[in-house]
A protein has these predicted regions:
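N-terminal-proximal low-complexity accessory segments that begin disordered
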Residues: 1-117
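C-terminal anchoring/interaction modules
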Residues: 2-26, 400, 404, 415-535
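Structured, mid-chain assembly/scaffold modules that mediate subunit interfaces
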Residues: 95-258
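Surface-exposed loop-to-helix/strand elements on domain peripheries
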Residues: 125-128, 341-465
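Short coil/turn segments at secondary-structure boundaries
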Residues: 148, 175-176, 296-301, 387-391, ...
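Charge-rich, acidic-biased intrinsically disordered regions
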Residues: 151-157, 174-191, 312-331, 424-459, ...
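Acidic/polar, glycine-anchored loop/turn motif associated with catalytic or activation segments
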Residues: 218, 376, 488
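Extended, charged amphipathic alpha-helical segments
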Residues: 250-398, 444
Length: 535
């Protein structure tokens, strides 16, 4: 039977060994003369070391720490901040994210899991309203939520997004501080990435990288934060390093949030700026655009040169012509000739002007500029139309660009809600339960705690080019059963459907009480009439 295999003889074993060696020698031969022009020594052309197109492209392999070390990260952050300040396209990309991802803020709507908690839908709705009111008390007041008492939670959302995109990451501590007139003591303290690092600029360790201390599985344990900015010395304040534990020792609550722009590799401890891949083309494009703008300015200058012959006699000029130039003229303090708007330059005897015509505006500037911006936008996941706010194509093309950009905005919105909004809300619910502001039976159970803390975060609506077409499409999706009124209302208005329908019911009731038409003929169904005699 097959389990009892006959043992090979010595001759057969020698033959099998010879065959194995022969096959190995054949398989190990270099491959030559691949198709497509020019021979290569590898099976994959991208791995070749002899092709001229890739001969000088020999990157190294390294760990996430080596490939994104301290010095490179600091340079990327510095250049990203400078681009945000001075580069038009870079600032447009960041502000476009802030406006469309956060806008006026992500509004929280509690959605407790009533099935897991054993509640009826009516009881769950009452509890949702109670939790929403508590959250509004905290989120709407800067003194409640912000450690600096300057921004409410919705403004903090925008600041967290911008800081993480520009610097790569931002940290949020949650110190407890009692304030007169405040209900809660949980404060949100934003910490810039510059302040998080190894104590006293020390070297990385096996369990400490760039100020992030982690355990054997790579989970963060603590963050090392400087009391100020390294390299900045203020009178009367010395720089010290504080170790902030990520989780509470007794409760296990999250005490420090780490909001990263992107985590692209397992084991990566710090985030890279959003603009990192496009910093080089951004800088070149900014220089090119500035040079073209300056050339156009010079070309627009109208300057008159007065050329004097050898026999020119200044005695024939009136005295006013010999006086000094007034402020704003073309005369400079060092006697140099300068161009100006409508300037008149007096040349010396024998001097002759040489005009260099810059031929501006350059007809090739716009196509080239647009092509480069398209590449930058593709790397940033922003279509050209959305990045430049230039919707000059057809309706279908403009709508496709908006939809593609909206996918990216939705991703960033979900990321912000997961990393900042929802964790900060859970901290507030924890404190509300501890203070007795809300009764949540079984909250100490981790499963029930998650059921109580469930919520949705609703941001500004997507917007539409043709609202009538979008409304008709929404109605059709509801009609054929692929969507519902809750989803469509949130997508089109950014408001919860329950809140919209309650307000609409109040409006219809008010109009009926004043003998006004309740709804247009093409409107939604009106609420049931409890007094048919009125009709």
């Amino acid at each position: 039977m097959w389990p009892f295999r006959k043992r090979d003889s010595a001759a057969e074993q020698l033959m099998n060994e010879a065959i194995r060696v022969a096959r190995a020698s054949v398989d190990g031969q270099p491959i030559v003369a691949q198709g497509g022009g020019g021979g290569v020594e590898t099976r994959w052309r991208g791995a070749s070391r002899v092709l001229r197109s890739v001969a000088s492209w020999i990157p190294g392999l390294g760990s996430p720490r080596r490939d994104f070390n301290h010095s490179e990260r600091r340079m990327l952050v510095a250049r990203s901040r400078d681009a945000m300040r001075n580069h038009l396209i870079a600032r447009a990309a960041i502000t476009r994210l802030r406006t469309n991802v956060v806008g006026t803020g992500l509004v929280c709507r509690a959605q407790v899991d009533h099935d897991a908690l054993g509640l009826t839908e009516e009881e769950a709705e009452q509890l949702n309203g109670q939790l929403d009111r508590l959250w509004s008390l905290y989120a709407d007041d800067p003194r409640e939520c912000d450690a600096e008492a300057s921004l409410n939670h919705y403004q903090l959302q925008a600041l967290v997004l911008v800081s993480s995109m520009v610097a790569g990451d931002v940290f949020v501590a949650s110190p407890d501080q009692e304030r007169p007139g405040c209900i809660f003591s949980t404060r949100l303290q934003l910490i810039e990435s510059d302040r998080v690092g190894n104590p006293n600029g020390g070297m990385d360790r096996a369990d400490l990288v760039e100020g992030v201390e982690f355990d054997g599985l790579g989970a963060p344990v603590a963050y090392h934060v400087c009391t100020g900015y390294p390299g900045e010395h203020l009178l009367g304040k010395s720089l010290q390093w504080e170790r902030l534990a990520v989780f509470g020792a007794e409760t296990g609550r999250r005490r420090v949030l780490h909001v990263m722009a992107d985590k692209e590799r397992p084991g990566q401890k710090r985030g890279a700026p959003y603009l990192s891949p496009v910093l080089e083309p951004l800088q070149k494009l900014e220089r090119y655009s500035s040079a073209e703008l300056m050339a156009a300015v010079i070309s627009a200058m109208f300057t008159v040169f007065i050329k004097k012959s050898d026999g020119f006699n200044t005695n024939n000029l009136p005295m006013s012509a010999l006086t000094e130039e007034q402020a704003g003229g073309d005369d400079t303090s060092d006697g140099a000739i300068a161009l100006g708007e409508g300037a008149i330059v007096d040349l010396g005897v024998g001097e002759e002007p040489m005009i260099a015509n810059p031929s501006r505006p350059n007809a090739q500037f716009d196509p080239f500029f647009t092509a480069v911006v398209k590449e930058i936008g593709a790397a940033l996941e922003l279509p050209l139309e959305e990045l430049l706010l230039h919707y000059s194509s057809s309706y279908s093309a403009a709508r496709a660009a908006m939809l593609q950009a909206w996918r990216f905005y939705s991703l960033r919105r979900w990321w912000l809600a997961c990393d900042f909004c929802q964790p900060s809300r859970e901290l507030v619910i924890d404190e509300a339960v501890a203070r007795g502001l809300v009764d949540l039976p079984g909250y100490n159970d981790p499963a029930k705690r998650k059921a109580y803390c469930q919520a949705i975060w609703i941001g500004p609506a997507r917007g539409a080019i043709d609202e009538l077409k979008e409304a008709n499409a929404a109605g059709k999706r509801i009609e054929i059963g692929v969507s519902n009124e809750t989803l469509e209302t949130a997508a089109m208005t950014g408001e919860p459907w329950q809140q919209v329908i309650r307000q609409r019911t109040r409006e219809v009731t008010y109009r009926r009480e004043h003998n006004m038409q309740a709804l247009p003929k093409s409107g939604l169904e009106s609420p049931p009439d409890h007094n048919p005699k009125e009709e």
